[in-house]
């Protein structure tokens, strides 16, 4: 979320001004879209001269100018919502009840109410522009009894207003369901105008399709429930209903070609106005920004790339810094020299240490998340049979991953991993039933857990070495060995690690009280009762691909880190005059191989390698669904980039035997 409350120089001087520029362009393009709407609303095939004359007079009318001012206010509010609600990491609910909770969130309810109101305003402007029978809410009518001319309710105008409210709510609802507030970065950088020109046909197509869907749905809804708002408006405003006209909540009233045509083009105009604002904001927000690598003045050090790339609070600045790092490593030899340079005085590679340290921190964070997810799934017995029938490398993958984690040195400064969506991770540590693993595996104590999983898990012996917070032998193996701690610490130059503390034996079981036992029995009865309800199981079951998509929701940052590291390491083979990259080359290679092992193991899990289904044209960006495939491709490309550049020189790098064997496969182009 690009919050305006963040006190950051990048938000004040870059993001807000980009949002203002996008809103300005949306307002400037509004007269053009309004003119096209006027031409379509007054279209007459058999009277072209009168059609053009009427459109010209209507465009210069005071009612049209006032409607245009109202539409400008709607665009301003839409631009503010874009700035306030858009995010770089999509929120992916892992169950239907989580999605329902997101839709019913109070902030989302306010958002839906505002968009419904704006939809009514846009439809009011459209009805004023179309004029004729849609112009006002009250229309003169003749009563049969007295013959007096009275003001009756204009149901056509009411129909358009209610349709605008329905379309506004649909837009807000689809913004949550289809992640319309997710801003993704294009893999190929383009200037703003070619990017806008290329997206314009898709924008028009999505507007037309969504308008037709909304017209169909609203017509069906009004057919069944249209009498309710009509009677309420009639009694509230004291506007009688003209009995001589056919009501619109009937088949005869709805099968009006002129009404459906004007509703469709008005809906297209509404969606196109909003989608255009969204598109321009995305183009401006994802525009590349060049950060200086180093600065002569100390007050500008906070704005340099080595400092900005480790930013935690302002996510948009961190993403643009990683994007700049990826572009720098590929297309800017002069800036690469600044990365490889040494500080004066002192001669320390501070720039390279900060950049490489943050990139390695991102990769290690992703590796730890993948290992935790795999251990949680394996502990529940989901993939044990699959792992047994896999290839021979799966038996040594865990040891390879863990040995790689031991080989990778920790960065000297404290780092915080990149935040993932709140529906996936709420804490960085936890056991089997913690919030870290909860979205990926069902709770064994849950009433919705199958009996087969309970039998596979079983009860843990309190005297077992796996009792407590330890969940798998992988985590135990990552602990220091008592007989090798001193030798390893001497060879690594680090102080000896303290041995793992054995879990204390549990206290003697006390007999629960009668009240506690009664409450526990009632709780089990409620669980068993709810577990038999089909609707409850349907709402609380995990969505098959959501866990994998949520795990890689922020992988765009990792892709840029992989690209930046690999190209910088490859360029250092001929450009690094001081050899600053050679000191961290073993850590980089180990981190890449460890991450590759974890990614390969993840793609062996159910639903992890399945391709997402193609969706109907929508403004909701679905590129996050394929980020795991893009990450795997970027990871293998990064390793190939390094191995093909260094070749047999990698044999002199101090890495483990398992990692050397895996790199040999890349050298032989067998991956």
Swiss-Prot record:
Chain segments annotated as transmembrane: 20-40, 65-85, 110-130, 157-177, 221-241, 261-281
GO biological process: mRNA transport; nuclear pore organization; protein transport
Ranges of biased composition (kind: Low complexity): 385-403
Compartment(s): Nucleus, Nuclear pore complex; Nucleus membrane
Membrane topology listed for this record: Multi-pass membrane protein
Disulfide bonds: none
Signal peptide: none
InterPro entries, A to Z: Nucleoporin_prot_Ndc1/Nup (IPR019049)
Primary residence: nucleus
Molecular function terms, GO-annotated: protein-macromolecule adaptor activity
UniProt-annotated stretches for the region Disordered: 378-420, 480-508
Stretches of the chain found on the membrane's Perinuclear space side: 41-64, 131-156, 242-260
Gene Ontology annotations for the cellular component aspect, listed alphabetically: nuclear membrane; nuclear pore transmembrane ring
Keyword terms of this UniProt record: Membrane, mRNA transport, Nuclear pore complex, Nucleus, Protein transport, Translocation, Transmembrane, Transmembrane helix, Transport
Comp. bias regions, Pro residues: 496-506
Cytoplasmic side: 1-19, 86-109, 178-220, 282-671
PANTHER family: NUCLEOPORIN NDC1 (PTHR13269:SF6)
Function text: Component of the nuclear pore complex (NPC), which plays a key role in de novo assembly and insertion of NPC in the nuclear envelope. Required for NPC and nuclear envelope assembly, possibly by forming a link between the nuclear envelope membrane and soluble nucleoporins, thereby anchoring the NPC in the membrane.
UniProt record similarity statement: Belongs to the NDC1 family.
Annotated protein name in UniProt: Nucleoporin NDC1
Source organism of the structure: Danio rerio (Zebrafish)
């Amino acid at each position: 979320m690009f919050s305006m409350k963040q006190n950051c120089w990048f938000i004040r001087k870059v993001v807000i001004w980009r949002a203002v520029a996008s809103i300005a362009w949306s307002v400037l393009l509004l007269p053009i879209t309004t003119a096209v709407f006027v031409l379509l609303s007054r279209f007459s095939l058999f009277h072209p001269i009168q059609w053009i004359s009427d459109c010209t007079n209507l465009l210069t009318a005071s009612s049209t100018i006032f409607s245009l001012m109202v539409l400008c206010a709607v665009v301003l509010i839409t631009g503010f919502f874009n700035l306030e609600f858009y995010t770089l990491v999509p929120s992916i609910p892992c169950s239907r009840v989580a999605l329902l909770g997101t839709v019913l969130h109070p902030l989302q309810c306010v958002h839906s109410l505002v968009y419904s109101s704006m939809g009514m305003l846009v439809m009011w402007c459209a009805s004023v522009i179309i004029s004729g029978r849609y112009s006002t809410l009250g229309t003169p009518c003749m009563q049969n009894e007295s013959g007096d001319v009275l003001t009756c309710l204009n149901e056509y105008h009411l129909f358009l207003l209610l349709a605008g409210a329905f379309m506004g709510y649909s837009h807000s609802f689809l913004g949550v369901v289809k992640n319309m507030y997710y801003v993704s970065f294009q893999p190929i950088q383009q200037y703003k105008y070619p990017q806008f020109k290329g997206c314009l046909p898709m924008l028009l197509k999505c507007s037309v399709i969504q308008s037709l869907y909304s017209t169909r749905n609203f017509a069906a809804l009004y057919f069944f429930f249209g009498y309710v708002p009509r009677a309420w408006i009639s009694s509230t405003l004291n506007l009688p209903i003209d009995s001589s006209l056919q009501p619109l909540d009937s088949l005869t009233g709805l099968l009006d070609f002129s009404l459906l045509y004007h509703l469709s083009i008005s809906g297209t105009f509404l969606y196109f106005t909003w989608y255009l604002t969204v598109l321009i904001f995305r183009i401006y927000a994802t525009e590349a920004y060049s950060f200086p690598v180093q600065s002569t003045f100390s007050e500008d050090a906070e704005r340099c790339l080595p400092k900005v790339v480790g930013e935690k609070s302002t996510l948009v600045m961190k993403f643009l810094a990683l994007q700049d790092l990826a572009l720098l490593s590929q297309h800017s030899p002069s800036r690469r020299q600044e990365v490889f340079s040494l500080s004066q005085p002192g001669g320390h590679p501070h720039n390279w240490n900060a950049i490489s340290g943050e990139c390695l921190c991102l990769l290690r964070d992703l590796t730890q998340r993948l290992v935790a997810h795999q251990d949680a799934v394996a502990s529940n017995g989901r993939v044990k049979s699959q792992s047994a029938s896999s290839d021979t490398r799966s038996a040594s993958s865990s040891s390879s991953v863990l040995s790689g984690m031991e080989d990778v040195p920790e960065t000297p400064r404290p780092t915080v991993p990149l935040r993932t969506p709140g529906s996936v991770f709420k804490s960085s540590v936890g056991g089997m039933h913690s919030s870290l693993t909860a979205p990926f595996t069902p709770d064994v104590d849950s009433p919705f857990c199958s009996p087969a999983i309970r039998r596979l898990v079983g009860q843990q012996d309190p005297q077992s070495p796996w009792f407590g917070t330890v969940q798998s032998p992988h985590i135990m193996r990552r602990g220091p060995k008592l007989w090798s701690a001193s030798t390893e610490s001497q060879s690594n130059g680090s102080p000896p690690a303290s041995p793992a503390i054995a879990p204390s034996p549990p206290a003697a079981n006390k007999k629960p009280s009668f009240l506690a036992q009664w409450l526990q029995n009632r709780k089990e009865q409620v669980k068993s009762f709810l577990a038999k309800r089909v609707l409850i199981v349907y709402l609380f079951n995990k969505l098959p691909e959501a866990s994998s998509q949520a795990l890689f929701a922020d992988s765009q940052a990792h892709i840029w880190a992989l690209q930046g590291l690999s190209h910088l390491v490859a360029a250092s083979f001929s450009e690094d005059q001081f050899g600053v990259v050679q000191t961290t080359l073993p850590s980089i290679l180990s981190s890449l191989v460890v991450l590759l092992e974890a990614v390969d193991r993840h793609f062996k899990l159910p639903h992890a390698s399945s391709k997402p289904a193609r969706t109907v044209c929508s403004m909701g960006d679905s590129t996050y669904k394929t980020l795991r495939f893009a990450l795997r491709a970027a990871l293998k490309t990064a390793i190939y980039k390094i191995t093909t550049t260094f070749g047999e020189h990698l044999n002199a790098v101090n890495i483990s035997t398992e990692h050397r064997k895996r790199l040999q496969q890349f050298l032989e182009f067998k991956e």
